[in-house]
């Protein structure tokens, strides 16, 4: 096959997996296999002649722990087949909240969604509202919806051709990582609930991909992972290294102040989350969409990276640390297994616990921890939206 054909194929794969940190997980039976392998050495990648790495500033580690008065809630997003067997009758978004006391998942929201939607979502527990991406059956793009969990009232808040990758509700404000109409890349945006409009980080920028959008409670800023769409398409990246040079940064709520924390093109970073004052955890692959997805630990001050393997786990797809700095919730694949499950892991004792659902999900989509003035106990039952109406 000619080199130009190879490059074209790789570019198509990159565009399809550009937001791969949030790829949904099919749950095959034990006979299936979702393992990917690679015999290429990612550490051999070298910067192109004349290419400069971004200069990283001196990093001041924030002092003190986040507000302990906030309620920490683990939310897990799944998509299930409505008929229980296949997608012929459509799919539904199901949001689970995990109760630590009873050690059980509880459904707090369920609704049919469009077949082509990535169902990014978040919950405002104080006002009992779910915000989520969905679409009408004939649409191949996303829009933002809200559902009042007290009344079941649903509102469509936007009317455009969007692609949502993340939704966050922080300090009473709704944030999104979204690619708007006529744009390729996702970028952070703040949503005004009164005017129902987005304020984007930089509307003129359709080159910078923003991945792994999360709120860093230690820095009181957002943690973001960025790379260049143009650089992703270069011969060096698409045909030689197969690694997108990426930068982990902090960005404040105004989107005006950005602090780079770490840069690499030695391996592919998929997802990042702050563990404690001086540590960031990240899932990585040797190259783009190649090899097992494993966990690494970054020391922010020293810039040293080390493996953070979890005994008994062969892949960590997505994760969220607790504010206690010791507990890790993640979607992973146990050694010798092909099923993806949700686990809780204690870093100090290495105690690993599988969290079980009332019914096994068809696809696990996302895992998120929120910190708000109240949690699921504030809700009055769960909200189930169906064609014939609302059931409480």
Task: Please place each PLM-identified region on the residue numbering.
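Structural motif
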Residues: 82-96, 138-145, 183-190, 231-249, ...
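Repeated scaffold domains used in trafficking and secretory/extracellular systems
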Residues: 62-66, 115-123, 162-171, 207-218, ...
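Short coil/turn segments that connect the beta-strands within blades of beta-propeller domains
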Residues: 71-73, 126-128, 171-172, 219-221, ...
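Short loop/turn segments that connect beta-strands within beta-propeller blades
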Residues: 99-103, 148-152, 192-196, 252-256, ...
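Residue position within the beta-strands of beta-propeller blades
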Residues: 74-80, 131-133, 175-178, 222-226, ...
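An edge-strand/N-cap motif at the start of beta-rich repeat modules
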Residues: 44-106
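Surface loop/turn motifs at the tips and blade-to-blade linkers of beta-strand repeat domains
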Residues: 109-115, 157-161, 202-207, 261-266, ...
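C-terminal motif of bacterial Sec signal peptides marking the signal peptidase cleavage site
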Residues: 15-18
């Amino acid at each position: 096959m000619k080199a130009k054909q190879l490059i074209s194929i790789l570019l198509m794969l990159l565009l399809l997996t550009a937001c791969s940190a949030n790829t949904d997980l099919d749950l095959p039976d034990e006979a299936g296999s979702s393992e990917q392998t690679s015999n290429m050495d990612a550490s051999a990648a070298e910067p192109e002649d004349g290419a400069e790495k971004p200069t990283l500033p001196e990093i001041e580690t924030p002092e003190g722990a986040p507000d302990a008065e906030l309620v920490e809630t683990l939310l897990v997003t799944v998509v299930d087949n409505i008929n229980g067997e296949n997608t012929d009758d459509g799919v539904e978004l199901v949001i689970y909240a995990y109760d630590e006391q009873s050690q059980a998942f509880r459904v707090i929201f369920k609704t049919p969604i469009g077949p082509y939607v990535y169902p990014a979502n978040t919950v405002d527990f104080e006002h009992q509202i779910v915000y989520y991406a969905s679409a009408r059956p004939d649409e191949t793009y996303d829009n933002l919806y809200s559902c009042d969990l007290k009344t079941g009232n649903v509102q469509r808040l936007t009317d455009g051709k969007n692609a949502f990758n993340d939704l966050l509700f922080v300090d009473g404000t709704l944030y999104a990582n979204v690619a708007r109409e006529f744009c390729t890349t996702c970028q952070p945006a703040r949503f005004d609930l009164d005017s129902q409009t987005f304020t984007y980080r930089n509307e003129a920028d359709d080159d910078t991909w923003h991945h792994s959008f999360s709120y860093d409670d230690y820095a009181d800023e957002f943690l973001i992972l960025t790379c260049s769409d143009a650089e992703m398409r270069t011969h060096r990246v698409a045909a030689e290294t197969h690694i997108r040079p990426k930068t982990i940064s902090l960005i404040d709520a105004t989107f005006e102040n950005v602090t780079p924390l770490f840069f690499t093109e030695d391996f592919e970073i998929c997802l990042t989350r702050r563990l404690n004052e001086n540590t960031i955890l990240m899932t990585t692959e040797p190259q783009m969409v190649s090899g097992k997805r494993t966990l690494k630990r970054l020391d922010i001050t020293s810039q040293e990276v080390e493996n953070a393997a979890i005994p008994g786990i062969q892949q960590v797809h997505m994760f969220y640390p607790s504010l206690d700095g010791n507990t890790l919730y993640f979607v992973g694949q146990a050694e010798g297994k092909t099923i993806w499950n949700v686990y809780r892991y204690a870093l100090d004792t290495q105690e690993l616990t599988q969290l079980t659902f009332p019914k096994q999900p068809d696809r696990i989509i996302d895992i998120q921890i929120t910190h708000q003035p109240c949690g699921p106990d504030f809700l009055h039952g769960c909200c189930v939206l169906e064609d014939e109406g609302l059931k409480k």
